Amino acid sequence: MKIVTTVQEMQQITNELHASGKSIGFVPTMGYLHEGHATLLRKAREENEIVVLSVFVNPLQFGPNEDLDRYPRDIDRDENVAKENGVDYLFYPSVEEMYPSEQTTTVEVVKRTDVLCGKQRPGHFAGVATVLMKLFNITLPTRAYFGMKDAQQVAVIEGFVTDFNIPVTIVPVDIVREEDGLAKSSRNVYLSQDEREEALHLYRSLCIAKERIEAGERNPEIITNLVKEYIETHTKGTVDYADLYAYPSLTMVEKVEGRIILAIAVKFENVRLIDNITLTVK
């Protein structure tokens, strides 16, 4: 595995790979890698001749009162996970390397960002789309891999790639969970022991809602109220949202049918956790 820290060297490598016709699987991350990331890397390894992993904590996607400064970082751990999962190139640029001067151009994304985290975190997805435009141009991927834990991000990226005719296939990968159901996340390290126990109720609330849908409930308001009430009863967290939309358009539905997403965000004392399920309802 080769570690690359400059845009110029990474572009030179991927230009040569592209010219030789090799397929490139790209996994963009903010580091502090866990089993969810490892799953993305293994899928990229299975489906491509070359695997590129980027580790970059992107300041553009953090709001003024968010956790940019304390976001967990451990490049030694990330290197080990990368090596264990068959990465060929680890792209590890500094902020100064990615943004040598103030951006004069950013990518604004609309519609799919009007709800869920996009509504709660203004500017977040513009930051995500901007850094991905840069990373896609630097790494020239055939396929790019994203976890469905942030299903809104996947929907936004799919729309952005389609709208700009970017020649990359977006590959969504199912959420990876702990044995007790908690969605794996780099931010889980912020949870206290009690909060870690309470956080299990996030996924449980989604499973209960899924059972109600499978039993025939088709009123989205009843489903989302069920989820909110369950979380508020079983945790000390604050529900940021518990919403149900068509997926991937993220538009309102009057009836639970077709492909839908039920997504939640809950704030604990030091961390905000997200989770979701997607279903196809007949």
Swiss-Prot record:
One molecular function GO term is:
pantoate-beta-alanine ligase activity
Q: What is this protein called?
A: Pantothenate synthetase
Q: Which InterPro entries match?
A: Cyt_trans-like, Pantoate_ligase, Pantoate_ligase_C, Rossmann-like_a/b/a_fold
Q: Which gene encodes it?
A: panC
Subunit and interaction comment = Homodimer.
Query: Where is it found, in Gene Ontology cellular component terms?
Result: cytosol
What domain of life does the native source organism fall in? Bacteria
> Residues that bind (R)-pantoate, according to the entry?
61, 153
Please list the residues that make up the active site.
37 (proton donor)
The family annotation for this protein states:
Belongs to the pantothenate synthetase family.
